[in-house]
């Protein structure tokens, strides 16, 4: 299988679930991809699920209740196996059907929604697994190809105008409102 990320040194491609969960980030790498050519009709599953909100959580029971073709059933089995493997690993997987994420339109000079390239932060080391079965996957940008918006002088000045507190706590304000992640 050709590595679709060979031009992106920040993405490590693995060939199995075991390799995915047992690999560590190092150097410039900031993402791992378990690239698979999945059999089955994931589009059929999406078409038969009911979108209740912009983001609808899909339970195992919801999946099992679907009347599917043979190819749809293959897709369902892959999803169920992935959920089980993640659960056995100690993760808390959730399956979501997405229409769209909410947009952050509060400020016209900086956005903090998921449509803005961003990083994730956790006070403890944690694993986040994103899996796209149908539709466009998330984009990724190398760390050395981006600049934090809070370091752009014009944006930083706007944020300082928005902030109403002591200068010594400005960085805390940026973290508290997630401006530092974009």
Regions found by a protein language model. Give the residues of each.
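Generic preference for hydrophobic/aromatic residues in regular secondary structure cores
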Residues: 11, 31, 95, 107-109, ...
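Extracellular-facing segments of soluble proteins and assemblies that are Gly/Ser/Thr-biased and enriched
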Residues: 70-115, 120
């Amino acid at each position: 299988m050709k590595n679709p990320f060979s031009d992106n040194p920040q993405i490590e491609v693995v060939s199995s679930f075991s390799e995915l969960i047992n690999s560590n980030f190092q150097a410039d790498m900031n993402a791992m991809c378990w690239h698979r050519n999945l059999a089955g009709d994931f589009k059929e599953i999406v078409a038969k699920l009911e979108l209740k909100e912009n983001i609808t959580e899909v339970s195992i029971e919801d999946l099992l209740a679907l009347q599917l073709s043979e190819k749809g059933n293959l897709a369902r089995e892959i999803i169920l196996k992935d959920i089980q493997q993640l659960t056995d690993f100690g993760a808390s997987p959730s399956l979501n059907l997405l229409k769209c994420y909410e947009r952050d339109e509060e400020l016209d000079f900086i956005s903090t929604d998921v449509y803005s390239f961003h990083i994730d932060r956790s006070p403890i080391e944690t694993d986040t697994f994103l899996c796209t079965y149908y539709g466009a996957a998330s984009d990724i940008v190398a760390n050395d190809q981006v600049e934090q918006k809070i370091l752009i002088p014009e944006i930083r000045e706007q944020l300082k105008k928005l902030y109403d507190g002591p200068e010594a706590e400005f960085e805390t304000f940026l973290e508290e409102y997630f401006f530092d992640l974009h």
